[in-house]
């Protein structure tokens, strides 16, 4: 995803936004995977276009541009790194089931602010497929509040009783079983016809 500041191009009254995509597929220099304009063998038909939501958003002078969240289970710490459009005070508030468990503030310097918050011992709730617990976080700037969420979980590779390396989630062996689904939607290729179609 990417964004563009179009402030300088806006005019009073009605404006029109035109979004276009040009893709040379295997005739261009960009990465393309196994797509070719002339498919065959292991190569799939070329596809390009707008396949995710495009929108206009009015933002204040100081707004969140990017947020990175990194959990560390052994230390009960979660690190937040935020990029903002201009230097300002940034507040980080973590809640678990509506209860505040961590809060910190930092001033962005060169459009960057970061904090490491340690969760109280009684607030550590690790994520798993059987217990998909999520924490909520509010990132507050002078004129904007952004909400997101994260999970506390740790992936490791540890030997089992026979010395065979196993993937472990939060210290417990877990079987990873994936599916390679290279099917495309008939009408939209990458874009499904509806949210319901993705579930079935």
Feature roles, as predicted:
Residues 70-76:
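Short, solvent-exposed loop/linker segments at the N-terminal edge
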Residues 10-14, 27-29, 119-134:
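Short glycine/proline/serine/threonine-rich loop/turn segments at secondary-structure transition edges
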Residues 1-63, 86-87, 99:
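Accessory beta-strand-rich segments of carbohydrate-active enzymes
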Residues 16-19, 131-142:
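Short, aromatic- and glycine-rich surface loops/edge beta-strands on solvent-exposed regions
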Residues 2-8, 112-122:
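Exposed aromatic-hydrophobic patches
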Residues 22-29, 142-145, 171:
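Short acidic/polar inter-strand loop motif in beta-rich domains
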Residues 76-107, 113-116:
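Beta-strand-rich binding/interaction modules
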Residues 57-62, 66-68, 145-200:
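Active-site-adjacent substrate/metal-binding segments within catalytic domains
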